[in-house]
Amino acid sequence: MSSEKRVGMVEKSNNKRQRVNQVPVFSINDHHDVLVEILRRLDGSSLCSAACVCRLWSAVARNDSIWEELCFRQVSPRPSLSLRSVVSALGGYRCLYFLCIRPVLARLPKLLWTRDQLQLSLSLYCVHYYERLYVGAWLGDAPPSSLIFLRKPVNVV
């Protein structure tokens, strides 16, 4: 890690050289801990792409703690520490991700809701809740019709 100032020679228009202090250049490769923190926040495909950048990034991307974070990002609370030794014996968190977690994530539908879709879903939920709460009591506990089916698109031909 070189944080010292660099000195360079600059040639002026009158053919005289003059010393000039240059600003130190920041390189992410000089800061291993920063690189680990950045890679730890990537998804699986981005982490694989980052491993192809250079040898250093490839070595850092093979770090098991990065893959552990990726595997258990969605799990709360985090599994116990005794699980770490079991996973290490079976090939590590990278193998766990590629053999178990990635295929499951690939099968899940990608839900990207717009603001209108979210508001519609919440409105339908409220209507459904009040129908169950109030209408059922008025009609002698008869099950009311629900509007929840409207959340899914209907193909009318």
Swiss-Prot record:
Protein's GO biological process: gibberellic acid mediated signaling pathway; protein ubiquitination; regulation of gibberellic acid mediated signaling pathway; regulation of shoot system development
Swiss-Prot/TrEMBL keywords: Gibberellin signaling pathway, Nucleus, Ubl conjugation pathway
Species per Swiss-Prot/TrEMBL record: Arabidopsis thaliana
Matches recorded under CDD domains: F-box_AtGID2-like
Compartment annotation: Nucleus
Pathway: Protein modification; protein ubiquitination
Protein name according to UniProt: F-box protein SNE
Cleavable signal peptide: none
Function recorded in the entry: Essential component of a SCF-type E3 ligase complex that positively regulates the gibberellin signaling pathway. Upon gibberellin treatment, such complex probably mediates the ubiquitination and subsequent degradation of DELLA proteins (GAI, RGA and RGL2), some repressors of the gibberellin pathway, leading to activate the pathway. Can partially complement the absence of GID2/SLY1.
Organism domain of life: Eukaryota
Subunit note: Part of a SCF (ASK-cullin-F-box) protein ligase complex. Interacts directly with SKP1A and SKP1B.
GO CC terms: nucleus; SCF ubiquitin ligase complex
Location (main, coarse): nucleus
Gene3D superfamilies the record matches: 1.20.1280.50
